[in-house]
Regions:
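Cytochrome P450
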Residues: 1-221
């Protein structure tokens, strides 16, 4: 899909840098601020809105509804919460459908326009498929980006010598990012629930039993 080739992704760097610079400028003169809510949490959604050329007046509205979809991955979500999320999703789809059709008729340089022209097995994506992909893009980098930025800053303050090293040599940024991913990985654990009786390494699980898989332990051996 041309919208997601390495070259297309690389071209998003100026957009990301512009969004990050703007968010940092907003908090630079404040005596104190919340790094998570005012910077880290906003970066992925703001970047995605920029890439999609989403109207400014609808960005916060769309982000609130789409990001709520991440709750569907929670094994403890209630039926009432599912119903509420379904209403929000329907509102987003209703709003985005004419926007997608307009971009298909008059494509620009934004990601949404790219999706309207993308071919899979020789066929264009349907409007429904485009909206589903946009929602997936909003969700995919949210919690991971927010958590990695927040955890990385915490670790830098815990290790001021490493902070000073990174400040003195910005070329270490890529290596630092890789180390943060290892040391404070954004997905620490996964919850799984047995759909039926099963035995794994002599451990018996009955239907409904829940297990926590601690992925972070692999990076701390």
């Amino acid at each position: 899909m041309a919208a997601f080739t390495p070259r297309a992704v690389e071209q998003t760097q100026p957009t990301i840098e512009r969004v990050v610079a703007r968010l940092l400028d907003e908090v630079a003169e404040l005596d104190e601020f919340d790094l998570v809510s005012q910077v880290a949490q906003r970066i992925p959604s703001e970047v995605m809105c920029e890439m999609l050329a989403f109207p400014l007046e609808r960005r916060e509205w769309a982000a609130e509804r789409v990001l709520g979809m991440s709750r569907t991955l929670d094994p403890d979500i209630t039926p009432a919460e599912v119903d509420a999320l379904a209403v929000g999703l329907a509102e987003v789809e209703e709003y985005m459908l004419p926007v997608v059709r307009e971009r298909r008729a008059n494509p620009g340089d934004d990601l949404m326009s790219g999706l309207t022209q993308a071919m899979v097995d020789g066929e264009l994506l349907t409007d429904t498929e485009i909206i589903a992909n946009i929602i997936l893009l909003f969700l995919a980098g949210q919690s991971t980006t927010r958590s990695l930025i927040s955890n990385a800053v915490v670790e830098l303050f815990r290790h001021p010598d490493q902070m000073e090293l990174l400040r003195s040599d910005p070329t270490l940024d890529r290596a630092a990012a890789e180390e943060f991913l290892r040391f404070v990985g954004t997905i620490q654990m996964l919850s799984k629930r047995a759909l039926g009786p099963v035995t794994i390494d002599d451990v018996k699980f009955e239907e409904g039993d829940q297990a926590m898989i601690v992925l972070a332990s692999a990076n701390r051996d």
